[in-house]
Design a protein with these regions (language model features):
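Beta-rich, blade/repeat-based domains predominating
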Residues: 41-57, 85-99, 130-152, 182-203, ...
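Beta-strand-rich domains and repeat architectures in extracellular enzymes and scaffolds
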Residues: 33-68, 312-314
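Blade-level signature of beta-propeller repeat domains, shared across WD40, Kelch, NHL, RCC1
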Residues: 289-322
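Beta-propeller fold detector
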Residues: 30-37, 80-85, 122-129, 174-179, ...
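Conserved beta-propeller blade signature
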Residues: 59-62, 101-103, 152-156, 203-206, ...
Length: 322
């Protein structure tokens, strides 16, 4: 009986430990130096605005402002190919009916695109489209896009109107919410957005960049709550399992657990003059220290990929410690 109780206690302890790790545990990371090809295809990676996403195979897609468009790396960091248009600001990869697609925001071109993984365009939402009836079309400079399971499209117009615009699955304008301001329920550069299914009801997780906070909104555009404040210009968000990663333009990367607590912070740059510094030359970079994190993604093992806003192009990897 004694041995049975001991075994049961051990099993419960192990179960609790696994449950904690799978839910809201702290995460530890080690930096992986020189993981990505420095000069993919024999050319400089930059300039990059700095979006990053992963496909199901683990390939890494990084946006550039070069004629190559989006550079694609293997999970081992080897350059594979270049696809799609240049000047993509942020991107999300989503699987639909067995096929993966890229959703891309292009603020300087005033459009949102749906692309195949080879870069072929499927459709676009553009201010120039006469069939679109959304307001402030002359201010349409979208920073990011996400898609709900029902096909609804949410566009963070952070460089334009400072509203999040909602379109139905057929790309027809439905509504908008937010608007410019510093108070709760308003945006000062809504710069990143993701659909979040981890809570009791589906929500949108929005990076309110210049207000230095991340927050929840419901799918009808009702403000729910601030999740974390006093961040350093959160630029984007990617969710994997119980965790969400936020690259902060002011030289840091933060990972939040499902409950909003801080699970890890990476690449913290103590030098204020190097933060959000597009032109910082490579000879001033420090291994494992970020300068201008702009896009990020978590792989299935919770390893972290970060792309920077950089004239020269800079992509990082941190490996989770198990």
């Amino acid at each position: 009986m004694k041995h049975t109780l001991i075994a049961l206690a051990c099993a419960l302890t192990l179960s609790t430990a696994i449950s904690t790790l799978g839910a809201d545990a702290k995460l530890k990371y080690s930096y992986v130096p020189n993981h990505f090809d420095k000069d993919p295809g024999g050319q400089s990676q930059g300039p990059c605005h700095g979006g990053a996403a992963l496909d199901e195979a683990g390939n890494v897609y990084v946006t550039t402002d070069t004629p190559r468009g989006i550079t694609v790396f293997s999970k081992d960091g080897k350059f594979l190919r270049a696809v799609g248009p240049t000047r993509v600001h942020a991107l999300e990869i989503r699987k639909e009916n067995g096929t993966e697609y890229i959703y891309a925001a292009r603020p300087s071109d005033h459009e949102v695109l749906k692309l195949k993984l080879n870069g072929e365009q499927v459709w676009k939402i553009a201010a120039s489209d006469e069939n679109q009836n959304f307001p402030d079309k002359n201010k349409f400079n979208p920073c990011a896009v996400t898609v709900a399971p029902d096909g609804s499209i949410f566009v963070a117009d952070g460089y334009g109107s400072n509203y999040v615009l909602k379109f139905d699955k057929d790309r027809k304008f439905v509504s908008r919410f937010g608007g410019p301001g510093a108070e709760e329920g308003k945006f000062n550069t809504c710069h990143g957005i993701a659909f979040d299914s981890r809570q009791d009801k589906p929500l949108l997780l929005v990076c309110n960049r210049n207000n230095n906070r991340v927050e929840y909104w419901d799918l009808d555009g009702i403000f729910v709550k601030v999740i974390q404040k006093d961040l350093r210009m959160p630029a984007a968000v990617h969710i994997r399992g119980n965790y969400a990663v936020f690259p902060e333009l002011q030289g840091r990367v933060t990972i939040l657990a499902k409950d909003g607590s801080i699970a890890a912070q990476l690449g913290d740059n103590p030098k204020a003059d190097q933060r959000a510094n597009f032109g910082l030359p490579p000879e001033q970079w420090t291994e494992g220290i970020t300068n201008s994190p702009h896009g990020a993604s978590l792989d299935p093992d919770l390893n972290v990929i970060v792309s920077e806003w950089s004239k020269f192009g800079r992509v990082h990897k941190w490996a989770v410690q198990k």
